[in-house]
Amino acid sequence: MSSQNLNRRDFLKLAGISYGGLLFGNRLDSYLKSSSPQMDEFMPDAEIAITAKEKWVQILSGSQTRVWGYEGQLLSGSGVTVQNLPGNYLGPIIRVKTGMKLRIYFHNELAEDSVIHPHGPRVPEASDGHPMQAIGPGQMKVYEFEIIDRAGPYWFHPHPHMRTAEQVVMGMAGLLSVWDDEEELAVPGASTGLNDIPVIIQDRNFDSTNQFLYNPNNMWGYLGNRILVNGKPNTVFALEPRAYRFRILNGSNARTYKLAWSNNMPMQVIGTDGGLLPAVASRPYVMLMPGERIDIWADFTALARKQVILRSLSFDPMGGMMGGGGGGMGGSGGMGGGGMGGGGMMGSGLPMGSAFDILTVSVGRRAGTKPVLGPLAPLSVIYKAEDFATARPFTLDMSMMTWTINGRVFEMMEVAEDEMVHVHDTMAWEWINNTPIPHPMHMHNVQFQVVQRTVPATSSYATINQGLVDTGWKDTAPVWPGERVKIAMTFGPHAGMYMYHCHILEHEDMTMMRNYMIMDHTMPPMPM
């Protein structure tokens, strides 16, 4: 842990003083120290090593591709599996049960700083992967946390300051699959993943030698012209004529997908970011923005010896707000930025909102066991819009080609007064999208429920509105142009400084990210 503490001290020395209702650096240090766990009291059930390193893998025919990836190893303990994916840049897949305590040793063998963010689960501040916790080449960071959340399709990825987007493009992402007894009763094989089909959808650009080409634009971020599933192109799953569970992650930096089956069978949604829904949500298609996960129950019983394609359908990503409605473009009068027309069509051979195939399911003749979906349990808490007459507003905007939240940009050690909450506070926040493009808004260390959408009066919204699934727990929510999205949540049990941001990774790196502080009675008094 010495590298982590040194990092924190170095950041605090460089932080300086902030003004205008913000926490001063030395007082913020007190908050961070008081929120850190006592590591000598932690007794893990399992210890895992994760190493970030460069390697070469075969993605396209011809030359291999240089990638960065994680490699995992189970060092001690039982009840946890760590599955590496040979010949792939993705992974590992870590499968663990709710209630288990993990100690993870993160080794950085890259030539630049990095840090891992566990995306979805609530963890102590010291293990959340804030950019200030990044470690340098050759260093190690220790993560210690208990899985306190319900079963869900969580994941992990890098989160260094201004380098998250390119590190993810280079290949760094893994799955943290959490199961519990409730899920095991509802979904056959939940504890083992017997019926699971993990699907990580990404898009990439390649140069003439098959190397990843990172060429984002300022508006849309990085849009690739090749679709990869689980790190490979042209994916075909050979499956039996029975039901399977498709656990889909949008692992792209910026691209939104409108998922549908080619035979028009409905998308049967059984879960979202934070686990199972209280009831199956049937949709003609499902919208999936970067960072979001969706859990689909797909029954191929009637499709023996046939093929069905999972596609992304066309949609209008612009919201009818080319001028940035409400000043969202800072008076720039159009998209600007060079090659950023509607859907980024000049910056990518596959514009945002265009239609394309993602993967093919080739159904065989016979099935062995035929799993049957059990009853889904009700949520332990249901928030309702009428219980939250007021909400803290957070306006998403753009000024002079800089993305902002409430007019602010990211500062490493800055927390404003309206970004302070207390452990066990239950409240609503409202995202207000004043920009011409959609944003997937992600919060660290909390699962929330979308309780209200105030929709814009634009024809483009009709191209996506049937694909929203708001009936479960979320950590990332789509906010369409001109839309207001009210979310409700209870903070805790961990106190400390966490983050919220747009999960278009280029937007995050370009300052569309802020800190928020969860305070408790053990912390020093708030600065006046």
Task: Say what each PLM segment does.
Residues 393-403, 410-450, 475-495, 501:
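C-terminal substrate/ligand-recognition segments
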Residues 146-150, 299-305, 490-495:
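Short, surface-exposed loop/turn segments at beta-strand-coil junctions that are enriched for proline
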Residues 263-274, 410, 434-469, 495, ...:
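Active/binding-pocket-proximal capping segment
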Residues 154-159, 303-316, 494-504:
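Short, surface-exposed ligand- or partner-binding patches at beta-edge/loop junctions that are enriched
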Residues 4, 15-16, 28-297, 318-397, ...:
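Histidine-centered copper-binding motifs that mark active-site loops
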Residues 1-10:
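N-terminal secretory signal peptides
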Residues 285-287, 472-479:
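Extended, solvent-exposed segments with strong compositional bias
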Residues 288, 298, 417-421:
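Extracellular/surface-associated beta-sandwich interaction domains
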